[in-house]
Amino acid sequence: MNAVSGILMLVAFLPYVRAIVNHQTVPSPVTWAIWASVDTLALLAMKKEKALNGQIIGAVTGAWIIAVLALVFGKPTMGSIEWVSIAGAMVGIVLWQRTGNAVLAIICSQIATFAGAIPTFVGGYQNPAQEDPVAWTIWFISCIFALFAIKKWNLANALQPLTFTVINTVMVVLVVIRPHLL
C-alpha cells in the first residue's frame, strides 16, 4: 500500500504537468515553492521519526518539479496565506532545532501545508476548470492507499497522510463532484 500510494502520488503529477504546459492550469511559483519546502521539512522530520512513507516521497519529488515549472509557466502571487505557510515552516524548523522534537516539525509543516491549500480551495471553488480533475482524483486515491499503509497511528506516522487526505478530498469535491451538480 505504501509503495502504491507513492507511485500514485507521482503519477498524478503527470496530468498536472501536461495541464501546465498546455496553459490549462496556471500554478503559483510561490505556493508550489512553499509546498515543496514544507513537504521537504515533513519528509526530513518523518525520516528522523522513522515514519517515512511513499506518499511524502512522491509529494516532495512532484512538488519540486511543479515549483520549477511554475517559474516558467506560473503567475507569481504572495498573499497572506503564503506568508502564514512560510511562518509555519520556519516555526517548525526552529522548534525542531531547539527541542530536537521532529514531531513538532511535522505538526508545523502540516499546518503550513493546509494553510497553503486555502488559495487552491478558493480557486477550485471560483473556477473549477482551472484545476486538473484527473490529477486531483489520482492524488485522492493515493491518499486512500496512504491511510491504509499507516502502520502506527500516531502524529509522526498519520498526520501527513491525514492532512493530504483532507486537502485532496476538498479538491475532489470542488473540481470533480461540484461541477456536475451545477
Give the ranges of each region predicted by the language model:
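Alpha-helical membrane-protein topology signature
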Residues: 1-182
